[in-house]
């Protein structure tokens, strides 16, 4: 039996997606800011919403699980500490 790939949904990467016209319009209208300086209103609202949902004082958005793990490790260790991770 031959399995043919579906062309309706392609989850390989966000680089192969094509936004529809509505998505492009939403991106053009979106508020923008510099998240590095804590000035992006969208990221600020996301962090506030999620921290509120979880009953936490504050939140920190990171774009990947790998980055979240790195932040956690750096938070709990000092330079020169050793860590064994699986």
Where are these regions (language model features)?
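Pyridoxal 5′-phosphate
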Residues: 2-11
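Short polar catalytic/cofactor-binding loops
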Residues: 14-18
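Conserved N-terminal alpha-helix of the aminotransferase class I/II PLP-enzyme fold
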Residues: 19-65, 86
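Glycine-rich helix-loop-beta junction characteristic of Rossmann-like nucleotide cofactor-binding loops
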Residues: 51-53, 74-77
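Short, conserved alpha-helix that lines the donor NDP-sugar binding/gating region
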Residues: 69, 73
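Conserved PLP-anchoring active-site segment centered on the Schiff-base-forming lysine
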Residues: 75-86
């Amino acid at each position: 039996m031959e399995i043919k790939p579906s062309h309706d949904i392609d989850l390989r990467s966000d680089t192969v997606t094509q936004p529809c016209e509505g998505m492009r319009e939403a991106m053009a209208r979106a508020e923008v800011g510099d998240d590095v300086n804590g000035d992006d209103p969208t990221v600020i609202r996301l962090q506030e919403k999620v921290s509120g949902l979880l009953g936490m004082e504050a939140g920190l958005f990171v774009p990947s699980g790998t980055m979240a793990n790195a932040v956690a490790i750096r938070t709990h260790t000092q330079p020169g500490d050793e860590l064994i991770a699986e």
